[in-house]
Amino acid sequence: MSQSICSTGLRWLWLVVVVLIIDLGSKYLILQNFALGDTVPLFPSLNLHYARNYGAAFSFLADSGGWQRWFFAGIAIGISVILAVMMYRLKATQKLNNIAYALIIGGALGNLFDRLWHGFVVDMIDFYVGDWHFATFNLADTAICVGAALIVLEGFLPSRAKKQ
């Protein structure tokens, strides 16, 4: 039985494109205007800081010799395909799940582009309190985390809200 793509969660793929444009645009601006390691204070506790991440979150496996680039690229592709299939199986009206999946796909594809094009992921958001700095991250990472948080939130909502 075929169904109109507009009636499925794939209707929300426009959000993937928005995340990609914002993420890749921010990384382009950093690459054009910052030297590696440059820092510009924005607000108390928030800097723009150009860093390269050769691993995953928190630079996991960053010093592993290069194989991790392809490993994490494969994970990004696999997760994106799985979530796109899940979106296809969902109704377009199931907003929370579709938004969550679209944010995760957009973030995964943004970081995938960096891995394949540059060989590293461009990070630039430096949050700190006093002398303690959180791991530097980017807007793709933010989209992935917000998407994951929405999935957790959806799990706590009453079942009637889930069916919409």
From Swiss-Prot:
Report the EC number(s), separated by commas if there are several.
3.4.23.36
Keyword match Zinc:
no
Enzyme class, one word?
A: hydrolase
* SS bond partners: none
Output one GO MF annotation: aspartic-type endopeptidase activity
Q: Which residues form the active site?
A: 123, 141
Hydrolase listed as a keyword: yes
| Record keywords | Aspartyl protease, Cell inner membrane, Cell membrane, Hydrolase, Membrane, Protease, Transmembrane, Transmembrane helix
Report the InterPro entries cross-referenced here: Peptidase_A8
What's one Pfam family the UniProt record gives for this protein?
Peptidase_A8
Where, by residue number, does the polypeptide cross the bilayer?
12-32, 70-90, 102-122, 137-157
- Single Gene Ontology BP annotation: proteolysis
Matches recorded under NCBIfam families: lspA
Q: What does this protein do?
A: This protein specifically catalyzes the removal of signal peptides from prolipoproteins.
Task: Please state what the protein is called.
Answer: Lipoprotein signal peptidase
Question: Could you tell me which species this protein originates from?
Answer: Shigella boydii serotype 4 (strain Sb227)
Write the lineage as a comma-separated list. Answer: Bacteria, Pseudomonadati, Pseudomonadota, Gammaproteobacteria, Enterobacterales
Gene giving rise to this polypeptide: lspA
